[in-house]
């Protein structure tokens, strides 16, 4: 039994040592230059140096990251296609029931990579200087304020 276990461990470590034997693609579901893209490229550079192998980012922007997630879900499960995603992946699963993939079934999270802040910003000359003032303004002028977001349902 011990010999079989040792043999199995040696075979596994041999297979592990050979990965990656070819370039690794990281799918990013947002445009080049976005914060997700920038962090993804830093990660690709570091993984490439660590593995001594080419690791590149492929941007598949659109549909709040769902185009890239769908491509990752349909890629072979060989480790040569990775998805760099953010919280939109979980939000999409809850908000969009007819996605062409099932994140829980088709994808597997392997590591948290970065934490980025989400901040609310207004133009410098906008009268509201805090959230309470912004809420008061929105209530006093229903339907007059707009916002921009890269998220689901934007």
Model regions and ranges:
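Sec/Tat signal peptide C-region and signal peptidase I cleavage site
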Residues: 13-17
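Extracytoplasmic "Venus flytrap"
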Residues: 26-40, 61-63, 149-154
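Short, polar/charged alpha-helical segment
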Residues: 36-52
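Residue-level signal for nonpolar/aromatic packing positions in well-ordered secondary structure
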Residues: 24-26, 33, 40, 57, ...
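Sec-dependent signal peptide recognition
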Residues: 1-7
